[in-house]
Amino acid sequence: TKHEPVYKPVKTSYSAPYKPPTYQPLKKKVDYRPTKSYPPTYGSKTNYLPLAKKLSSYKPIKTTYNAKTNYPPVYKPKMTYPPTYKPKPSYPPTYKSKPTYKPKITYPPTYKAKPSYPSSYKPKKTYPPTYKPKLTYPPTYKPKPSYPPTYKPKPSYPPSYKTKKTYPSSYKAKPSYPPTYKAKPSYPPTYKAKPSYPPTYKAKPTYKAKPTYPSTYKAKPSYPPTYKAKPTYKAKPSYPPTYKAKPSYPPTYKAKPSYPPTYKAKPTYKAKPTYKAKPTYKAKPSYPPTYKAKPSYPPTYKAKPSYPPTYKAKPSYPPTYKAKPSYPPTYKAKPSYPPTYKAKPTYKAKPTYPSTYKAKPSYPPTYKAKPSYPPTYKAKPTYKAKPSYPPTYKAKPSYPPTYKAKPSYPPTYKAKPTYKAKPTYPSTYKAKPSYPPSYKAKPSYPPTYKAKPTYKAKPTYPSTYKAKPSYPASYKAKPSYPPTYKSKSSYPSSYKPKKTYPPTYKPKLTYKPTYKPKPSYPPSYKPKTTYPPTYKPKISYPPTYKAKPSYPATYKAKPSYPPTYKAKPSYPPTYKAKPSYPPTYKAKPSYKAKPTYPSTYKAKPSYPPTYKAKPSYPPTYKAKPSYPPTYKAKPTYPSTYKAKPSYPPTYKPKISYPPTYKAKPSYPPTYKAKPSYPPTYKAKPTYKAKPTNPSTYKAKPSYPPTYKAKPSYPPTYKAKPSYPPTYKAKPTYKAKPTYPSTYKAKPTYKAKPTYPPTYKAKPSYPPTYKPKPSYPPTYKSKSIYPSSYKPKKTYPPTYKPKLTYPPTYKPKPSYPPSYKPKITYPSTYKLKPSYPPTYKSKTSYPPTYNKKISYPSSYKAKTSYPPAYKPTNRY
């Protein structure tokens, strides 16, 4: 070809590092056309200068080292690398690689090798044939059930189930209420609410001329032009006939609170005389723009304080009122059901379980779980010991280091302010605190007043109602447990919980001096605190509740296992493990070559000068191994002791449960769940299922005749579960269900229903969650993990795990009794002694050492690797 003369190698055309003999075979004319596949100047420096000048648009690749890389296929270039490069030799196909550090031992066919793994490898355990693994997912995992393109599943419901309509994503559902409910209308954002008043009230226009009123009317003040109307995003509700309306004021209005009849008011800013109303309407005097008018009211009037423009009023309702909750714009409503319906929550339901159930809470993605333990387990605290308390103990939550605690006081305690000193008053005095500018004032009311909430509407319920706390949208619900449950806190590290106080505690708040004062209240008034939007409330629990400690985000919890669980220890990086052997094993040191001897010969190995010899012992000797200085040993325990393993920092423990536990996995927010099916359903897995049709077909499971398929929806669809006939519905986002008149409401943020003891809850998930089907006990699921996922398994009580080791661990294999290997070792090897056939190693360890499990000789370890993992010789 026209480039052949240019490409022909010439000795004088190469730079100094070139070794001409390497190129000698090319001088024979072979059927090689270099220009067909290789640009002649690629990667070279001076070899093909004439052609490089022709290829004007070609820019030769500059490298950090002078690599000649572009030779014909038969040429194996010798690369020059930077000083830090550690070359890995390449061998012909028949080459049997010799390890660079530790020899590769050949074993008889019955030897079951224990592989070594890279540091990032998370082993997948092997289980008995009847084991049903519970799957966990990494935070980024988004499993989605795969259906054939034409699959239109139909959900199956119990006979009494009333189907829920599915709505577009922008649909805002309106719950149904009992007959006594007086609806609070919702308005568009631009709606200017006109409050409804009792029958005797004569409304007054806001800006139009004031009409004349009956003699009993006390005028509503007029405001200067700078008045900012009370925002109308929250509609003003309608009130019962006995309600006395509260006027709204401009933002700069300084409220003068109303006091009980015995209170002698001290004026706060400017004393305002009260006016006696004449039978005819008296015009309101006009004041300068900065005047803060205080209206006068009839004696029975209950004053309504002024609020900042951002204040969201909470209406008060009669005792039988069933509140209609307000929802964020993204709320996907769940319809309300008849009282006998037991709904399955779809967002953050956390059911209660029978007293024997140890719940596995769901946590934020960064949370490292702290396991729950069986009742007989005596926990060794891993972060901060949380003592157990008598049933009447009110738990004091644990906080991150940066938390500034607000102490709780006994009922008679008079708080000492933390900002400005406040004088002490007689016991009947109710102080009027000062607040920072951003504070949303809360009015004081007579004892019979029904408060209007200041953050999100919280209806009032009869005295028997048990309130459900409300949470911000980003809150991950904490389950409620039976009294015997020892809970774990799942707060993020930045969480500042709010303490709860005894009912009689009167907190005295201190605020910045610029605060617009908050009125004082009659003794029987229980003020409701208002919180900024970012406030994360702390739930108060019944007296028998055992609080869950909260840990920083970096905390790695240590799981506990059922009493029969045999722990899998973890070792420090420098630990040289000593494997456990079958009773008849003839151990072999793995340092210096040991010749083969007659079968009765017990070899005494030879060691390097630095070796601390470990002798061989008679059969009855219980050896005490020695460990490197950094080794953290674990003491030996009686045979009945169930060890609790410790794990390296990167270990994400999987909690294991008693055999009867039906686990419900917790998922990250982005998890797409698989639908659940009736117990008789034989599901076909939905992630890596082998198709039965052409490759584009996603296997469609076969169902029993009674199965009503659950549809697959577009990505934006928020699935609604099917429920048993007696299920009580739980709202999906911020829905407030309707209750019987005896029901005590919980706050409106995230409802947490309680269920009968036999109820197996289906966890609720974020809106993007696609449900995963639950299968009957005999179902053998196929893994649905991405290739990079390394699951952590739980084990049945009788499972003996196979050990995994840190990267630097040098495992020593175990052999059948008749095997006498002969090995040569590098000079730095640490020898392991050999023992007589009946040797039972009784190891005494330092306190933190985690015992290594020995397995029966019939145990066959099966190690599975992720698809991309190529195990390398790490010796």
From Swiss-Prot:
Keywords: Hydroxylation, Repeat, Secreted. It is found in: Secreted. Residues 93-139, 166-218, 425-466, 474-518, 526-537, 600-642, 741-763, 777-807 have a biased composition (Low complexity). One of its GO terms (cellular component) is extracellular region. The modification (3R,4S)-3,4-dihydroxyproline is found at residues 92, 118, 148, 158, 178, 188, 198, 214, 224, 240, 250, 260, 288, 298, 308, 318, 328, 338, 354, 364, 374, 390, 400, 410, 426, 436, 446, 462, 472, 482, 522, 542, 552, 562, 572, 582, 598, 608, 618, 628, 638, 648, 658, 668, 678, 704, 714, 724, 740, 756, 766, 776, 816, 836, 866. It comes from the Eukaryota. Residues 140-158, 764-776, 808-819 have a biased composition (Pro residues). InterPro entries: Adhesive_plaq (IPR002964). Residues 80-267, 279-537, 556-820 are annotated as: Disordered. The modification 3',4'-dihydroxyphenylalanine is found at residues 91, 95, 117, 121, 147, 151, 157, 161, 177, 181, 187, 191, 197, 201, 213, 217, 223, 227, 239, 243, 249, 253, 259, 263, 287, 291, 297, 301, 307, 311, 317, 321, 327, 331, 337, 341, 353, 357, 363, 367, 373, 377, 389, 393, 399, 403, 409, 413, 425, 429, 435, 439, 445, 449, 461, 465, 471, 475, 481, 485, 521, 525, 541, 545, 551, 555, 561, 565, 571, 575, 581, 585, 597, 601, 607, 611, 617, 621, 627, 631, 637, 641, 647, 651, 657, 661, 667, 671, 677, 681, 703, 707, 713, 717, 723, 727, 739, 743, 755, 759, 765, 769, 775, 779, 815, 819, 835, 839, 865, 869. Residues 75-868 are annotated as: 85 X 10 AA tandem repeats of Y-[KN]-[PALKTS]-K-[LPMIKST]-[ST]-[YN]-[PK]-[PAS]-[STA]. Sequence repeats lie at residues 75-84, 85-94, 95-100, 101-110, 111-120, 121-130, 131-140, 141-150, 151-160, 161-170, 171-180, 181-190, 191-200, 201-206, 207-216, 217-226, 227-232, 233-242, 243-252, 253-262, 263-268, 269-274, 275-280, 281-290, 291-300, 301-310, 311-320, 321-330, 331-340, 341-346, 347-356, 357-366, 367-376, 377-382, 383-392, 393-402, 403-412, 413-418, 419-428, 429-438, 439-448, 449-454, 455-464, 465-474, 475-484, 485-494, 495-504, 505-514, 515-524, 525-534, 535-544, 545-554, 555-564, 565-574, 575-584, 585-590, 591-600, 601-610, 611-620, 621-630, 631-640, 641-650, 651-660, 661-670, 671-680, 681-686, 687-696, 697-706, 707-716, 717-726, 727-732, 733-742, 743-748, 749-758, 759-768, 769-778, 779-788, 789-798, 799-808, 809-818, 819-828, 829-838, 839-848, 849-858, 859-868. The modification 4-hydroxyproline is found at residues 89, 93, 115, 145, 149, 155, 159, 175, 179, 185, 189, 195, 199, 211, 221, 225, 237, 241, 247, 251, 257, 261, 285, 289, 295, 299, 305, 309, 315, 319, 325, 329, 335, 339, 351, 361, 365, 371, 375, 387, 391, 397, 401, 407, 411, 423, 433, 437, 443, 447, 459, 469, 479, 483, 519, 523, 543, 549, 559, 563, 569, 573, 579, 583, 595, 605, 609, 615, 619, 625, 629, 635, 645, 649, 659, 665, 669, 675, 679, 701, 705, 711, 715, 721, 725, 737, 753, 757, 763, 767, 773, 777, 813, 817, 833, 837, 867. Provides adhesiveness to the mussel's foot. Mussels produce one of the strongest water insoluble glues. The mussel's adhesive is a bundle of threads, called a byssus, formed by a fibrous collagenous core coated with adhesive proteins. Almost exclusively composed of repeats of a decapeptide. This is Adhesive plaque matrix protein. It comes from Mytilus edulis.
